[in-house]
Amino acid sequence: DRIWDLGMSGWEANRKSIISVTILFIGMVLAYAVVGLVLPQATLQEQYTFIMDRGTAYNSTDLSPERFAHGMTFLRINTYVLIVFFIFAFIYRGLGTSMALGWNAGVWAITLVTAVKVNMAAAASPILLALIATVALSPHVLLEGLAYLSGSLAAIFFSRGVTLYKPTDSRFFKVLNAVVVLAVVSFGMVILAAVVEHFWAPFMLGFL
């Protein structure tokens, strides 16, 4: 709307959208994290079955470096997720973007908080464990969220562009250019997130 209704440049609109939605995403992660900290493990297992029973990549409470040293696996899975969220955002626009952010925030916050809670019980220094785990895993979560956000914005632009302009309209090509740029940025962030998860997370978790 900033571009179509207010006449704002694409770069300025994208910057403001990314900043505002990133803050929203961080708020979602923190909200889910608080829920994960407050509720007992049995309740989490019952209420968040769609997260806890998704497979060993999610329901495992293992914080060993070996668990996260699988960059290609994360890259493949996150690329599939990015494509799905692009489709949802193209169809539902803002609602699709909100779903992408909420899903990603919920999955990672509940998964990681659960893993930290379980490991804190046997840790010599629970606070240090929580701090190292946060530093190790937060960069991947943030990069992944930004990747899905950029991909969703690309889908929204594309959806609005094909609705408002004919394929021969010069404005459609401007929209298409913005879509391609955002799509490349989003996939680049998926790659970067996988690299961070493969190298940074195991490195930091090695201090536990």
What do these predicted ranges mean?
Residues T22-V38, I91-G106, H140-L143, S186:
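Hydrophobic alpha-helical membrane-insertion segments
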Residues L112-F187, I191-L192:
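Hydrophobic alpha-helical transmembrane segments and adjacent short intramembrane/lumenal linkers
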Residues E12-I77:
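Hydrophobic alpha-helical segments and helix pairs
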Residues L82-I87, T134, I191, V195:
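Alpha-helical transmembrane segments of multipass membrane proteins
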Residues L192-L208:
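Juxtamembrane boundary at the C-terminal end of a transmembrane helix
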Residues R2-A13, D169-K174:
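Membrane-interfacial, low-structure loops and terminal tails that flank and connect transmembrane helices
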Residues S64-I110:
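Internal active-site segments that recognize and position negatively charged phosphoryl groups
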Residues S9-G27, G94-S98, L176-V184:
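Alpha-helical transmembrane segments and their helix-start/interface "positive-inside/aromatic belt" motifs
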